[in-house]
């Protein structure tokens, strides 16, 4: 599973700065979900090919009241759900009582915890970090998050132990189609899971009991092997009523990153709400293949159905590549049709293509619509090759590729989507510029060229 790293510490110790550096963004993703703190931030990150989720848990000052105490409590929940903890302290402030309190709590969790001394720049390194050894958390890793100093060394240490596990997960994904069922609370995720697993043709292996964590369920349907990742964390049992679902954004993000295909479940009776779009954004950002299911469809009046369809066209136009299903998980209407879309999306997301084929598509696209001029010179796109799958990545080589405008990239995405019949999956375009061996070198003119240049210059002067 993709590991989750929680950034923990007092307010203003640099958690957001480190978060932005790790996720390479200034605009932190704010998860504004019901029942969750408003300022907890989540983002996907990658370091040396290893993917992970970063959580900025918000500051814990120790004297919270009212809403602050709720936010602190939810920060503790995020810490408890994470796999690795980066505990940030401020070298300029030195060791504080709140730092000691937080350290005391972290020691009780028995999780991999790395003590990170931030803002070490401009200070005597050894003197600045010395007080923090008192916290009893082992080695002190010094960084200057604002400038990026020490961050790569820190992350290499933090992620060293998960390398083998990540490779094993990737190998396992090749053998079995993993699909994650995600959605906000009470849209019918658990009912859909039970319906999908309850079909007569489904053979479930080692059915787990009730748990609040995401559940990985291996099963077989029509001689095809699947792993279903259930983020709702509740199971059907005889004579037991459905329990209240505990929604966890961390578990949802982990499930998205670990899946090949994501099924986003929405409540048709409520239409599309902002929380649905937040989750959809995470799925798109991860690059996973996508299927959208509108649940509770059979209970709607015809007028409301028309309204919902209009809203879908208006608000989900940016994911027009995803199949849309109108289902009733409770009665089973339309549920079986999900598999066809899942298989099609998975096939498109994992297909392999030759360099010659991708280059031919590029050449046709450039012939039909040339890249724009930049400072009087035409951007040249020479050849393309595959750079990865799930999502499909097309790497295009050429000159001045850093100047390719967004609208032209969108054009190429549409061309490749149409040519490769990429149904149900996003496609990503990456550019590479070849190094110019003559960059920075002046041409040395021959004697004959110098004579010609002087003659031309005389002609220009006479005209003036």
From Swiss-Prot:
Residues 351-435 form the KH-like domain. One of its GO terms (biological process) is ribosome biogenesis. SUPFAM superfamilies: P-loop containing nucleoside triphosphate hydrolases. Keywords: GTP-binding, Nucleotide-binding, Repeat, Ribosome biogenesis. It comes from the Bacteria. GO terms for molecular function: GTP binding; ribosome binding. GTP 2 binds at residues 183-190, 230-234, 295-298. Gene3D superfamilies: 3.30.300.20, P-loop containing nucleotide triphosphate hydrolases. Residues 3-166, 177-350 form the EngA-type G domain. GTP 1 binds at residues 9-16, 56-60, 118-121. Associates with the 50S ribosomal subunit. PANTHER family: GTPASE DER. GTPase that plays an essential role in the late steps of ribosome biogenesis. Belongs to the TRAFAC class TrmE-Era-EngA-EngB-Septin-like GTPase superfamily. EngA (Der) GTPase family. This is GTPase Der. It comes from Teredinibacter turnerae (strain ATCC 39867 / T7901).
